[in-house]
């Protein structure tokens, strides 16, 4: 029977789905045919983690190579396929659009012929709900085939395995080799869409049908002309923009539901505004407009209990999201990009946990996603981190003659006269407050016993320091002076745009009394400014026995 000497149906479909492109035709198995080796190698996606696979045989057949063609004979149901599963496969086919072409009581050969005729143009990635997806779900419940010489059915990627019997096989990712719904931390793997392949004749090599979702995080500095980057700097209390961009699995079409979660961990000194969250789906990399998502009520959560500071944006089924305007369904394909934007700030109510300089206030995100179209497992992406930097000022007030004499209780105001990110109309009008934030009301700093003023949470920019008149009795009032914090280095490059974690700062001071304001220094994000005060002058007088006249801050006092 010529029909039983080749499996045009099973082979053609298998070669399409399994990625094996050798020509197949109906032919006799002759004496000169190459004997079967039953070897297959499944190549792992280069970005996938360690995974294993299991094989399930659907049809058994004698398979050989002849004249560059793969030839099969004696097609029958595999021994491991129960009568119930065979019946269910036939029922699934009869429910298909072209089921009328299948006889009422079909043989294995009839089923193989039908598959070849109706499925040979199918996509290499099996779509959820397609007939092959249904068949894969039915066959997965059977006992997997153990490779030759192995003690277990699961086998690793990128190695050749062989089987006792040739024929038509289904290959699936071993559920135990990837993350589950409850245990996925650090498991950066995804499962393949069903792979259908013919094993026999020459060795077969296929590549798993999957792709690893990725996530990138960016932060935008409000300095004019800034773009999304890995680093920014800001004032305490200033809202800073963040962006998360996630991709989906290459085989997302194979999933019935697709769990998708951004888990964003903020360092202790940061606080997010969960009401600022927006999610937009872009069709592909060329799509610049996107479609904003109508967020479910439980999509955004913000947990700040204990040591946690976690913002989550999650979808129990990303494939079911709708547009914010109009509620129409948004198509999720392998090319889709999911973008989350929100704002966060260095917390003015928790400045003791704000990091000055160093490696900044880090903020990292990871993606948690459905990892297997054939099970309910989850995987976890490689995390991505951005950093928000802020700086501190240590102003030291001392006597101009004796540097060991520190001046206590001297008052100063610090005005942001050129900070990078001041709102329009606010430049030169806002004052630095005790916690480093900016406000419209004047705030007066007072030197401590060490003659110091310490304030952290400053952004890059220019600040004007003003000594309050009369707050330093016995000394002349210091003229106003400015200092400038910049991330632009002497060679003109901006350290905010470079990869190294720690920023290089350039600090300068502009002053009229050049000998009273020392050149500022920088150490790990803290700017030290030493300012000196001269004592008032004792002028010689005549005619006033026992009385001196001292000039103080432009006024005269009798002593």
Question: What spans do the regions from the language model cover?
Answer:
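Solvent-exposed loop/turn and edge beta-strand elements of beta-rich ligand-binding domains
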Residues: 2-559
